[in-house]
Amino acid sequence: MNKTRYRLDVAYDGANFCGWAPQPGLRTVGGLILDALRLICSEPPDIVVAARTDAGVHALQQVCHVDLISSPDPVWLLHRLRSLLKSETDLHILSAVKAPVNFHARFSAIGRRYVYRVIDKRSSWYPQNRYFVYRVNAFLQDYRMRRAASGLIGLKDFGAFCKPRRMGSTVRHLRQFEVIRQPDGQIHFFLESDAFCHSMVRNLVGSLIEVGRGALTLQDLFCYTKIAKRTPKIPTLPPHALTLIGIDYPQEHLFECQNRKTRQKRT
């Protein structure tokens, strides 16, 4: 039976979600979207997401795809989804468009972009930031963190920064790792990679925080990176200060090629 593929772009405040992945009895981003789709379509669709975010993580632009037999008009689908989800004020469907059959939200992606927000003792703390900013009770040295970040960029085995896994590669191409102190004193850590392992972003930023506070030397950090095994010396930061900025894709004629390349690298 022929199906039509749709790309959905989604934004959400992750504070009150138990992550993306649908789970019985839990409020998740993917679960709410699936519930809405079941009311729209006769068939129970599968949903594939570009970046499976953990509980508490936010997104400015998440991407997923679904295959539907009913082939609704995408404009109608967008309005219907928004109507069904209007009471969920921390979730918004940005767009819904038809996608080619070889578009894959996860495997067609060539980049994921994140920002992690931190504030240290150099700046005033405002209580309203507690849902989106991680507070560090120390004076962080920006230049040390920037040196550490620049040394982590490239194609490497990031096993030291990933949750242990039995199968699959931990080799990733980290293209961007910037440390930018904002005018209000917040420190924003911008990261971009072809893909990230589970907890990798929060562990990478955690390593820089340890370097910035003087608890971890650059030499030790790069040594852990070469060993490529998880160490308690690198903390996993909390999820509430992490935001998925967006997902990048190649031009349409390159979808199939990118799908094959990604599947080969991840298995």
From Swiss-Prot:
Stored InterPro entries: PsdUridine_synth_cat_dom_sf, PsdUridine_synth_TruA, PsdUridine_synth_TruA_a/b_dom, PsdUridine_synth_TruA_C, TruA/RsuA/RluB/E/F_N
Entry-linked Gene3D superfamilies: Pseudouridine synthase I, catalytic domain, C-terminal subdomain, Pseudouridine synthase I, catalytic domain, N-terminal subdomain
Keyword match Transferase: no
Pfam families per the UniProt record, alphabetical: PseudoU_synth_1
Domain of life of the organism encoding this protein: Bacteria
Gene Ontology biological-process entries: tRNA pseudouridine synthesis
Active site: 54
Keyword Protein biosynthesis included in the entry's annotation: no
GO molecular function, one term: RNA binding
UniProt EC number: 5.4.99.12
Role this protein plays: Formation of pseudouridine at positions 38, 39 and 40 in the anticodon stem and loop of transfer RNAs.
Protein's recorded name: tRNA pseudouridine synthase A
Encoding gene, per UniProt annotation: truA
